Every structure is written in C-alpha cells, then in structure tokens.
Swiss-Prot record:
The gene is hisC. Its EC number is 2.6.1.9. The keyword Transmembrane helix does not apply. Belongs to the class-II pyridoxal-phosphate-dependent aminotransferase family. Histidinol-phosphate aminotransferase subfamily. It comes from Thermoanaerobacter sp. (strain X514). This is Histidinol-phosphate aminotransferase.
Amino acid sequence: MIENLVREEIKGFKNYEVHSIPYRYKMDANETPFELPEEVIKNIQEIVKSSQVNVYPDPTAEKLKEELARYCGVVPTNIFVGNGSDEIIHLIMLAFINKGDVVAYPHPSFAMYSVYSKIAGAVEIPVRLREDYNYDVDSFIKVIEKYQPKLVFLCNPNNPTGSVIEREDIIKIIQKSNGIVVVDEAYFEFYGNTIVDAINEFENLIVLRTLSKAFGLAGLRVGYAVANENILKYLNLVKSPYNINSLSQIIALKVLRTDVLKERINYILEERKRLIKELGKIPGVKVYPSKTNFILVKFKDADYVYQGLLERGILVRDFSKVEGLEGALRITVSSCEANDYLINGLKELLL
C-alpha cells in the first residue's frame, strides 16, 4: 500500500551511499586531518554553557552571518546560512524549481545536484566535461541556448575531478543564462579564486561555500550562500525556522575568528604537491591536476587497488563505476602520516 503513496520521483531512488567500513585512515570524504583549533578546545566548556541549548537557536544566525560577511567581503544581508551546503542546494530547488523545469550541471560532478533535481521532478541535463576533465564551456553555452535551464550548477573547483572553470567563462555562462547560476565553491580555500565579488553585478548568481572542508567543521554541518538579497529572501521563505543549531553557530563563529586557516591550507597544499609527485612515479597510475584537497587517480584495475587499500585500512572513494570516471579513485589529501601510509600501500600493490 505504502508504495502506491510514494511520489513518482522517489520510486526507484537509491540512497546516497556513505561508507561505514572500519579504517585506519579515512581518505574518502575530503575531510581535514585537523581537529578544532586549540584555543577553541580550551574554551569548549564555556562555549557549551553559552550556547543555551535549552532554548531554540537564533533562527537568523545573525552573528555568524556577520562573521561570514567579513570573511567574504560582503554585507550580512548577502549571506544565507544552511545546515551544510547540501541543505542550501535543496532549498534552491524548493524555492525555484517546478516539476519539469530544466536543471543543467557538469558531469561528472557532485552527486547531490542530480539527487535534488530528481526529488524536485526537474529535467536534468548533465553537461559532459572534456576528456581531460576540464569544463567544456561551449557545450554549456549550447545547452543554455537550446534548453533554457532554470538552474545551472558550476562546481568550481569541481568535485571529484579537481578541475576548475575560469572566471571569464563563468561570466559568459551567467550572461547567457536567463535562469539562476549556482557556483559551488566548496573547495575555494584550496584554490583561491572566487566569483563572490560579482553577486551584485549579476542578480541571478548564487555562490555556495562550506565550513566542512578547509575549516574542518564537517560534523557541525555549516554551509552558506552568498548572493544578492532578492534571491536570498526566497531561500528564507522555504527554510525551516531553526536550521542551524546553537553549538554549530557558536563553534563556527569561534573557528572563523582564529588565525589557523592559512597555516593549515599551506600544509594541505604542500602535501597535495608531494602526493601528486609520489603517485606519479608509480607505473600505470594516472594522476590528474587538482585545485582542491583531493586528487583523482586512475588505475588499470581500480577495484584491485580499492580492495587492496581497504585491506590495509585505507578508505578512499571509488568512482570507477561512474560513467566518465572508469578506473578512477578519489583520494583525500590528509596528514603526512596518512599520505605516507597510502603511498607505501600503493607501492606494495603496484610495484
């Protein structure tokens, strides 16, 4: 009986898979190897006390918005805070997408663009990346001209390929589009280039960011959107009243006010460089350039490598069954210790 009541868009749906496999080193979800900054840990009792968990959190996350606005160089009214950037993607769909509307996004890219498009009943137009995983801007523009998508996603840098789309190409796509263009900058801190400064020039632009990656707050679920007020007012209409809990708001605020980010970013960038160099020395391994905290690597037998790493307690993300990513594993750049263990494990398997 229940099956007959389920929405057509949900029938045949598969859960987004999150691995719960025992591991020694978790290098599959692009998380930071760093814990909370020491000064935050020292004050954790005070933070918990001040969070007043017996009352509902600030529904507007005003203090956090102010700090994020300072970080981004905008005003607080240009900031919307969500329970992870995933929630914001969902809210964008709720606010703007009717059943049958067209949504375009790069392929391969972040899986949730497709997931939330399906839930919304949208018509999906995946735009293939080039063979080297760079953006095919001409194809995007052709799709926009032909299908007039109501929503276009650009992941920059792109997950899981690590490739980027240049600013002038983003602007070309925005100018061609009559719909909303969402530029997902989840990995911005590892890249350094942004389109945030263009939000007031283009009223159809939304920039997504997260504190899950560079800031190391994946467990708190704090994402944010940067856009003009005319767009954000509609996201506020469809969000739940208390979507960010008190502890997440306060800890995120404290972490944003620390000065550890630059040092931690530099550490990851150096480890990324070293990891790419070392893996590139192994015969039969193709390593793709990356502007993120992960690297995409192709193997002749990805399943053999994946299982071999798993047996050694290393969990990486297997994309080898995804169309366009045959033979590919995505590896998070982690601590020096974890990266060394990975390098040695791959050498044992392939040399």
